[in-house]
Amino acid sequence: MTATISLEDFLRNVQRRDPDQPEFLQAVREVLTSLWPFLEKNPQYREYALLERLCEPDRVVQFRVSWTDDQGRTQVNRAFRIQHSKAIGPYKGGMRFHPSVNLSILKFLAFEQSFKNALTTLPMGGGKGGSDFDPKGKSDAEVMRFCQALVQELFRHIGPDTDVPAGDIGVGAREVGYMAGMMKKLSNSAACVFTGKGMSFGGSLMRPEATGYGVAYFAQEMLARKSEGFEGKRVSISGSGNVAQYAAEKALEMGAKVITLSDSGGTLVHEAGLSREQVLAVMELKNVQRGRLADFAARHGLTFLPGSRPWHVKTDIALPCATQNELDGEDAKTLVKNGVLCVAEGANMPSTLEAVDVFLAAGTLYAPGKASNAGGVATSGLEMSQNAMRLGWTAQEVDERLHAIMKDIHQNCVRYGERAQGAVNYVEGANIAGFVKLADAMLAQGVV
């Protein structure tokens, strides 16, 4: 990067190369906008085209997945693996199965993952993968055949010291198990190549809970700086998958009232607050029955708002845990108007750039996902460590390590994001802290 190029000129150069990748361009703009003033004060990070290199993945793998459905028909899906940066360690990031999956979404996720993994302080690079395969409505046998077909190509590109995938949207313990099983068969090795595995074959206690718990731990640290906490607060959560479920569980444990959950059909609202038993019932619904919140609401006499998002409901703490760009500028204005204290992202980039601007302008405590949802990948790193040492830690040990990591991430964000009167810009703090770790590693290793 030349000393005279402006931020807008740099972003135009990125857009010129990838004009049809809006999610990736959005992620790059969000990160670089907060990095630019830091770079102007620290010219050593303008050397060796560090930013240009970070805006270009090490490798993009795209391939066809052919599989047979229960009717004997051949189906074809597209799959990807984005290996973004191995400067700090092997590529690490989840696999997403959803019809919306495309190159832009996975490049944005891999880009964010490199910064997120750097924040954990664990030796992990960044990557992401997935397919436009939709597991909804598929039988277990169909999901198994698809996962096995996918790994027949993916296995060439992953390994315990090369690239270690995990789960994401549409990929839970079932899918990870099918992929890990085929990987073992093809590689003739039992090495840790996937994380998020079942406990019966090398998984870690607390891994399912880690992302959701981590979001709550991070929000707790943010609130503590304002002499606040979860006790007695109203919490709105979007989503009803793994992250949302355990964020709700931990929020209840901390004394909060969880008033919303959502899925693609709409939003479940319970003004009195969901009980622990109801949250456990949602886990059963989503993880085992694979049902819908609308049916759950009808059975339990709760309010369900079809086609609605949770952000119009008055709340103290908002935890967007569904998907990217689910919370827009108007949603953010509504939350601010209703007096929201804290927004901590459980999903990856769930807030649009406009929404982020609204939160920052209002002085709302706002944590970007690369910081607040890093607990999941951090615990994946702990799973890798346990596998390498051929041992397993107790749930309490893993939870204590997770809590300590989230505290460290928060402190790093404060270190780089603290402003006048003790206010913290967590967006700048997270982006700068992650960048410094990545950039120092890249500078030390030369132009490679």
Task: Write out the residue ranges for each language-model feature.
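Adenosine-phosphate binding glycine-rich loop
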Residues: 2-27, 222-223, 336-448
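Buried hydrophobic packing segments
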Residues: 35, 106-109, 179, 215-223, ...
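General beta-strand structural signal in soluble alpha/beta enzymes
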Residues: 162-166, 190-194, 237, 260-263, ...
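Rossmann-like adenosine-cofactor binding region
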Residues: 266-366, 371
